[in-house]
Amino acid sequence: MRTYSCLQLVIWTCIFHMVDNSTLQGKDSSHFLRRIVNLKKDEGKMLHRAKRGWMWNQFFLLEEYTGTDTQYVGKLHTDQDKGDGNLKYILTGDGAGNLFVIDENTGDIHAAKRLDREEKSLYILRAKAIDRKTGRQVEPESEFIIKIHDINDNEPKFTKDLYTASVPEMSGVGTSVIQVTATDADDANYGNSAKVVYSILQGQPYFSVDPESGIIKTALPDMSRENKEQYQVVIQAKDMGGQMGGLSGTTTVNITLTDVNNNPPRFPQSTYQFNSLESAPLGTHLGRIKANDPDMGENAELEYSIAEGEGSDMFDVITDKDTQEGIITVKQNLDFEKKMLYTLRVDASNTHPDPRFLHLGPFKDSAMVKISVEDVDEPPVFSKLSYLMEVDEDVKEGSIIGQVTAYDPDAMNNIIKYSVDRHTDMDRVFSIHSENGSIFTLKPLDRESSPWHNITITATEINNPKQSSQIPVFIRILDINDHAPEFATYYETFVCENAKSGQLIQTISVMDKDDPPRGHKFFFEPVPEFPLNPNFTIVDNKDNTAGIVTRKDGYSRNKMNTYLLPVLIFDNDYPIQSSTGTLTIRVCACDNLGNMQSCNAEALMLAAGLSTGALIAILLCVVILLTLIVLFAALKRQRKKEPLIISKDDVRDNIVTYNDEGGGEEDTQAFDIGTLRNPEAREDSKLRRDVMPETIFQIRRTVPLWENIDVQDFIHRRLKENDSDPSAPPYDSLATYAYEGNDSVANSLSSLESLTADCNQDYDYLSDWGPRFKKLAEMYGGNDSD
């Protein structure tokens, strides 16, 4: 309370000083207001000062009041107040009524709640003095401020609860690592409540912190990551300038030492031992070596190499980037018989050295690698990787064309035998001497059919047939002039009837299957048997071609329509080869430009006296004749259909049988006499007699006319088929006829009616029914004696 009273005294002293410097103007003292502030209400002592109008600017109040009573702020008063209770004081503005309350009679202001400067540090309010009787303001409304003074009630807080930082290892003292920051919500302009000081609680003696800036620095030189990589530092921030009683906050900083290349690689052992078969292929991995480097990442990347000296040309080392190992591989073919042991020096060095630490020594290490070569039974080795041989195509069978040589590289030097791989010489053109490797021919050679022969020779150890090797042999067949030149193509040559002497009618060229090294050279001459041809001559163009030239004016197709011209062709190689080719020259009719129009075919027709119109007429007659022959043949195949009634007396094709007891009037069946004459025509259409037949449309076909048909035999055969038909009803079945059809146009001919009628009936009326019933009238008509 002593501090609080002193603070109020200082504030009001400043206010009174301001009042003393003011000049009072005006004569009416009734317009002066008096503001009375009670500095200490309990003491009962009051300081007052008179001034015209309202004379306050601001009040001050400490935050976080913890008393039980309301906190007194100040008093409002005007000289118009006579103390008789006629004036009423009203307070409006920020917090009026809930935070700040006023005694409307006395003008005393109190804080009803505890205030927090960090929430709101300034309140603006307005004061009024009103006459209770008239309700009018005795003074104009005035504005004043209540400022909240700060107390140290907030501790410093860091922006992060946990910081993460890194610093390179081997850093010097004072190397900056990271800066931490703490803030205090108290008023930095009032006292030391917001003045923060940093200190280190954990992490010494490795790190330190600047008390004002919060920058963490290294405190020890040359800290090694390999010894310790992670550090945890605790930093404290305290207000009140770090004095006793100040509030504080802490944070944690995790610091990692990052790697630098300050360690050279080191082999864990000085000597390595590996073995290799002498037959190991190139690139075979013999073993791995590794140098250790405690650094990390690219600082630990290594490069292996073989130092110049023994074995550097026989072996190689490859760096495995994933495992940082050196892989020893075979670089050249090994030979146990030549060298059995190799000693190599392998170096391992850093690929990214740090110049700052080169003074520590060379960043590489060396180790010795010994490689022992083991003996194996090796296959024969040829003296060459491949052989090329040449031979003339006219050599005799059995001629030697070359030799291959192979040897056993082993110390035992086994005997070698040679053979030809027949898969490469299917025609068995060549063979080889099994002991000395001489290759010779088995068949005649022909360069034109096979200019090259590629065979494979196999060399095999006699004592160990599994040990063998092969080599390709390329045999080129050299050309011999053994083919005569001949025409390059077939020439269709003609000469116009109106040709002039000396006219070129054909240029010929030739071909030769041989291939002389100096190229072809051909010559053309007439054959010796006909050195001088009166019709044509051969002109050698000296460029491997020749021209056929006429020797007279005009040619006649009627006299000679074809000429044969033999040509002698020979080359200039050794031995000289020649051949004779014959040109067939036709005589043709040509236009003025020399284009062929017609040749000897028209000449023959004209000689026979046939014109073009006659030829067309002959062809037309031939076509008509062929058409007539085809029509006649077609008509012959048509067979004449036999008429249903041969004569008017033949009425057999409608004879009706009445001995079928199931028959009625219109359901009786009559035999078709045409069918009886051609029974096979109905074989495929069998109708059941116990059902009503359906209407069947059959294709009408022509049947051959058979004059001699055994109708009786046909009827018996058909009867037998019906008797054996399983679908026909049994003979003793009862047939019921509910409808027997319409009346016949004739009187009833039923057998039932005939039995019941008088035996003496007159059948003469049958003669009136026409020729179809003539036979029936003859059978039943006439006298009884008949």
Swiss-Prot record:
Extracellular face of the membrane: 22-614
Segments crossing the lipid bilayer: 615-635
Keyword annotations from UniProtKB, A to Z: Calcium, Cell adhesion, Cell membrane, Cleavage on pair of basic residues, Glycoprotein, Membrane, Metal-binding, Phosphoprotein, Repeat, Signal, Transmembrane, Transmembrane helix
Pfam families noted in UniProt: CADH_Y-type_LIR, Cadherin
Residue ranges constituting the Cadherin domain according to the UniProt record: 54-158, 159-267, 268-382, 383-487, 487-604
Modification Phosphoserine occurs at: 785
GO cellular component, one term: postsynaptic membrane
GO biological process: homophilic cell adhesion via plasma membrane adhesion molecules; synapse assembly; synaptic membrane adhesion
Membrane topology listed for this record: Single-pass type I membrane protein
InterPro entries: Cadherin, Cadherin-like_dom, Cadherin-like_sf, Cadherin_CS, Cadherin_Y-type_LIR, Catenin-bd_sf
Sugar attachment sites: 21, 254, 454, 535
Cytoplasmic face residues: 636-786
Propeptide: 22-52
Signal peptide: 1-21
A Gene Ontology molecular function term of the record: calcium ion binding
Subcellular location: Cell membrane
Notes on the domains: Three calcium ions are usually bound at the interface of each cadherin domain and rigidify the connections, imparting a strong curvature to the full-length ectodomain.
PANTHER family, A to Z: CADHERIN-23, CADHERIN-9
Function: Cadherins are calcium-dependent cell adhesion proteins. They preferentially interact with themselves in a homophilic manner in connecting cells; cadherins may thus contribute to the sorting of heterogeneous cell types.
This protein's name: Cadherin-9
